[in-house]
């Protein structure tokens, strides 16, 4: 006998429903201990894992972010380009730490974010090229301030209203903070783009 199982996932204002056909034999089957993994996943399984990871990111984004939150793209100039992925992760972690500290100073709620680091290896596989970051974070801070913090320089917040001071801050590269734009699927398009 075949029956249908329905799995509902609620993400803030969005709901996903999975319809899963099941048989009684499949429901009652018990599995023993798993054996040691002997071979790599089949391409079919890798595709399913990739699809589920993208779906989870969409659910995470729709459940935690809404209108008024920010999508920030951060790149590096040639002189600031990190040599390794670990070095880039350290730089972006410091950036997020500065944002969290500023939010705390202003009495805003704690920082929530999704970070995706994109990079490709050169043809010889020895080095990375054009590493950059996509960050979805909760709003509250001014977009100009979020962009200004993409620097190694220490920021004197008492002088930030002076345009000359703002211009003197040397950024790590190009940075752009945009407000999230929702549609009927929330931020699904953005989440699929950054994966």
Regions found by a protein language model. Give the residues of each.
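Signature for HUH/AEP ssDNA processing cores
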Residues: 46-128
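N-terminal nicking endonuclease/strand-transfer module with a His-rich metal-binding environment
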Residues: 24-25, 62-67, 71-73, 176-184
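DNA replication initiation on ssDNA origins
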Residues: 1-60
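A short acidic, often aromatic-flanked loop/helix-cap motif at beta-alpha or helix-coil junctions
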Residues: 12-15, 22-25, 81, 121-123, ...
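Generic structural motif
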Residues: 4, 17, 112-115, 175
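Conserved His + Asp/Glu catalytic blocks
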Residues: 121-131, 137-195
